[in-house]
Amino acid sequence: KKVLVNDIEACYINLKGAETLNLDNWDGSISLVKYVYANTVLDKEDKDCVVFLEFVNFVNRMVWLSSTERLRSLGTDLPGGNLLETICNLKDGAEELEAFLREAGLAFNLVIRDKGEGKTIYCKMGKREVPFAPLMSSGTRSLVFLFLWYMRRTSVSFVFIDEFDAFYHTDLSIAVINKLLAEEHIQVVFTSHNTDIISNELLRPDCYFILEDNIIQPFCDLTDKALREAHNLQKMYKAGAFHE
């Protein structure tokens, strides 16, 4: 059953509570879904309306992250501005970040200090405390981005991480993937150019996709072979087994 249609031939809504909505006022500057959601009081007892509202709720909790650009989001408001200041305002922020980085194999002793210019994070190095920001490599900064999302993960439905391991070595990439796999109630999609993470031990063949010429296809649809756990997916990929 179609409850909302917007194409060349027709544009209509079939939801209880939207019968009197005037589509002449919709100028296309926002999606039709968002327009309906913002301008109607739908019947929450109607199953079609329930599905529509659940869909909107899911989309509003989608997040897009990029390791090579600034932190951005779709629907969900994630903290912006100075990363370390934001973490300082989290409960046990420095301790949580330290533990998160240790899981990734990075050992820092982090503390929050305010030395006259606002709160920020310092790193203990022997008897000295030095600002953490100048110590962060590109990879560490990328992990801090990821940490900010991770602390908000209970409010997120779907996360897309573009070039998630652009600044990671392979072991760190695998550690991050395993961290994400442990989250059962979030769908995660990430992109990478690192073929060293193509492994049956990490993900099933139907979880690996090739994106090329605006077409995305899973490995399992790109070969006639029955892919088994013993297969070396990376070796097959490099040999061209998944290129039509």
Which role does the model predict for each range below?
Residues 115-151, 155-158, 163-168:
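Conserved ABC ATPase signature
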Residues 9, 20, 128-131, 215-216:
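Short, solvent-exposed loop/turn motifs
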Residues 1-3, 10-13, 117-126, 207-210:
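Short polybasic amphipathic segments
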